[in-house]
Amino acid sequence: MERNVLITADSTCDLPAELKKKYNISTYPLHIILGRTSYDDGVNITPDEIYKHFKASGTLPKTSAVNVQEYIDGFLPLVEQGYEIVHINLGSALSASYKNCCIAAEQLGNVYPVDSCNLSSASGLLALEAAEMAEKGMSGKEIAENIRALTSKTYGSFVVDRLDYLRAGGRCSTIAMLGANLLSLKPSIIVNNKDGSMT
């Protein structure tokens, strides 16, 4: 039986709604914890609300991965309808989401998790490429293999405008933050596309 392929991704791929709709990519939200309340990324909280929380409280949000049952609950109806699923995960060095997705995939079959070794737009680009492969009629297994090969060619980097977030998260000292601000330095964070760690 020939199976149609759907592309899904973790919410951290940061694809705009128009692209998700155009390529029929659904996302699975990671959890953002502010104080004692847990929110679903991109569902019931926006980046602006997270920034407002930080400004008001001075504390960074915590995050948690999509859990195994959430993946199963999302994938099972699709697998039962005859779809293969290629899921683009947030880099495994950054989150347990990939590990959890692999456990769900083992239980369900016809689900192909891909460790993007990246985040944000870099993993979003992989999801878009996977969607184009699906449109060409490639199988889920073929798409997953091709996307895994592309992870080493996909680079993510970010220029940090404000160091107060890095200081609050323990990534730089107060002195380093003040010195960078005084000299108007804007550090760049580069994602290692071999394991998803950041430097």
Locate each region found by the language model.
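Catalytic cores of large soluble enzymes that bind and process phosphate-bearing ligands
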Residues: G42, T63-N67, N89, S139, ...
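Glycine-rich phosphate- or other oxyanion-binding loops that anchor nucleotides, phosphorylated ligands
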Residues: S57-T59, A65-G91, N100, A144, ...
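Glycine/charged-rich beta-loop-alpha catalytic/anionic-binding loops adjacent to active sites
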Residues: H53-A56, G82-H87, A105-S116
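Mixed-charge interfacial surface used for oligomerization/domain docking
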Residues: R3-L6, T12-K20, S26, H31, ...
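N-terminal glycine-rich anion-binding loop in soluble enzyme alpha/beta folds
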Residues: L6-N67
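Residue-level preference for short coil/turn positions at secondary-structure junctions
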Residues: M1-R3, Q81
